[in-house]
Amino acid sequence: MCLSLVGSEMCIRDRYNFGPCLSPTNAFHILQGLETLPLRMQRHMDNTRALLDFLTTHEDVAWVRHPDLPDHPGHDIAKRLMPRGAGSIIAFGVKGGREAGRAFIEAVELSSHLANVGDAKTLVIHPASTTHSHIDADAMKAGGLSDDMIRLSVGLEDVADIKADFESGFKAARRAAAE
């Protein structure tokens, strides 16, 4: 409020565009994080590639979407613009539909059930039964979402542990699909 009464137009515009000054503590934490960013991103991408291989060949997976996969519509662009990998977000479908997807999410223990992305820990969510459960089937389909879709944000854990966690999820999904 004070800025709008006494500040210059340029000062107001800068404050609007860039926000207030960082506190020294926040600046310190950002600098600390930047020191290890390349290492963390490399681990994210290594884990993502390993999980893409795992998911694309898994018998309980109906489909996998990620720009690093050759059948993705944006593959050529992603390969050109992001030669080290197109990020650690994967979407895949669990065979068995909505209930199988929900069972998968409820069975995993290492992976956190959160809607966030880009964390150090692996995050999974079943949009059809959580964030998009209030949307009708036609609107979900129009938005590119399906009942079997799991959104995965790959974390930094040991990839063997993530795979073992997912196997527990797939086992639960098979049981749910059989019911």
Please place each PLM-identified region on the residue numbering.
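Single conserved hydrophobic/aromatic residue that forms the stacking wall/gate
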Residues: 1-7, 11
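Short, flexible turn/loop "capping" segments at secondary-structure junctions
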Residues: 22-26, 82-85, 142-147
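TM-loop-TM module centered on a large, flexible mid-protein loop between adjacent transmembrane helices
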Residues: 13-17
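A conserved active-site cap/scaffold subdomain adjacent to cofactor or substrate pockets
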Residues: 19-53
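Conserved small-domain helix->loop->beta segment predominantly found in fold-type I
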Residues: 49-116, 121, 135-141
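PLP-dependent enzyme catalytic core of the Aspartate aminotransferase-like
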Residues: 106, 122-179
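Short, well-ordered beta-strand elements within core beta-sheets of diverse protein domains
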Residues: 29-39, 88-95, 151-155
